[in-house]
Swiss-Prot record:
Residue runs in coiled coils: none
UniProt record similarity statement: Belongs to the universal ribosomal protein uS7 family.
Annotated function: One of the primary rRNA binding proteins, it binds directly to 16S rRNA where it nucleates assembly of the head domain of the 30S subunit.
Protein name: Small ribosomal subunit protein uS7cz/uS7cy
UniProt-listed CDD domains: uS7_Chloroplast
Cellular component, GO annotation: chloroplast; small ribosomal subunit
Keyword flag Transmembrane helix: no
Pfam families linked: Ribosomal_S7 (PF00177)
NCBIfam families: rpsG_bact
Oligomer and partners: Part of the 30S ribosomal subunit.
Gene3D superfamilies for the chain: Ribosomal protein S7 domain
Top-level taxon of origin: Eukaryota
Amino acid sequence: MSRRGTAEEKIEKSDPIYRNRLVNMLVNRILKHGKKSLAYQIIYRAMKKIQQKTETNPLSVLRQAIRGVTPDIAVKARRVGGSTHQVPIEIGSTQGKALAIRWLLGASRKRPGRNMAFKFSSELVDAAKGSGDAIRKKEETHRMAEANRAFAHFR
């Protein structure tokens, strides 16, 4: 028996303008070299651009995009008897959101364009519509899991 207590689950703080945890998660993921104010600037500019493009609430577009990109299942490499198998595993909601945010930011960084706010807003709008690189990444992950369904018993 371990004598150490279990770690308390940290509650994500919400951002100052939208009072939303998702926005704060985005800011913390987009952050580079500790420049948090720049990260906030990028996110808020992207939200303004989404507001201008879609003429709807940018938070609802953000939620819809993240819901569309969040994977239900993924593959994990597992070594069994000298060979490595890709074993499909279910993903929890927190980990799924984190993956979705990572994929959205990665896809927007790869996009050609002027600045990060513009690229990120375009990626979010595309993801909310059901297209874009991040959605393709999710579908690819689901295909991989489906193809390796035979190894599900190695869990």
